[in-house]
Amino acid sequence: MLRALRSLGVALLLIGSAHAQELSAARLGVLYNIDVSNSREVALYYAAQREIPPANVLGIHLPNVDVISPEAFAPIRQQALDRLPTTIQSLVLVWSKPYAVGCMSVTSAFAAGYRSEFCALGCTKTPMSPLFDSDGWLPVDTVGWWPAMLLPSDDEGLARELIRRGIAADATALPGTLYLVRTSDPNRNARAAGYAAVELMLAHRMRVLELSTPVNRDVTDAIGYFTGVTHVGELPRLHFRDGAVADHLTSKGGELDGTSQMPAIAWLKQGATATYGTVSEPCSFVEKFPNPLVLFEHYTHGETLIESYWKSVQMPGQGLFIGEPLSRPYGARRP
């Protein structure tokens, strides 16, 4: 009896510890651009829908440009972090641009501060993230990072729909199929070497379908879609479940208004709830892109989208995380 009580006590401590480290609305900071239409409206709408405390919502002044200079960005970031409550552990950035700080993504620059070593000069690797495949979620307290996700606000209708999807997915267990697509592009197909491991490790939790060619029919059950091409020709055939994630390994996906390659925001317009793309040349290092296995390992253990996506990228300096950060389809975090 005594042993059983002790075991129960240990279990409760583990559960309590897990809940203490999970991301909640109370720990999410919401930043919007005072100088851009829709930014404030979307931020306030999001805070209301997610019941985020008003003290967590902060307006800042940002130039409405694609890329902000590191010199202009540094004081803006510092002033914002100084004004947010000390309980904040993650950020949502409610604007569409700037999406880059120099050659870093704006989400990574807010997370770690602008650091030149995060920018690849030529085809080089960049520093590892201390959050990669990590346990718990107290990044500010443990490593001094403020992981961020961009919630694009230029199209207010899309922003509201994105918020709806994220909330609608909560605690649904997200039934559906994870699609892993091989392509004929040898560089952009770099993640395919790990697809077999994804299927092996996740098949007991969801349907995982590895394809040697893009889908050639309409699919209505996508909870994830990972590929490697400059333009996703099959995009109109893809219909995503609320809470789904999708991205394509290519150089310029994070350039949200780009035309030479498909911008990552196209995934959101098609129905995904979160996506990812790089804002400067990554040279197809797989470490600079999301690892589907790591992402869904954390996602299916009850972590939020922002936690799961951030933990899936080893070298995130050039990568832009985009979507609704608090979506949690698989319920509360399990220890």
Predicted regions and their residues:
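Cysteine-dependent hydrolase recognition
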Residues: 21-335
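Bacterial N-terminal signal peptides
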Residues: 6-17
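N-terminal secretory signal peptides that target proteins for export/translocation
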Residues: 1-3
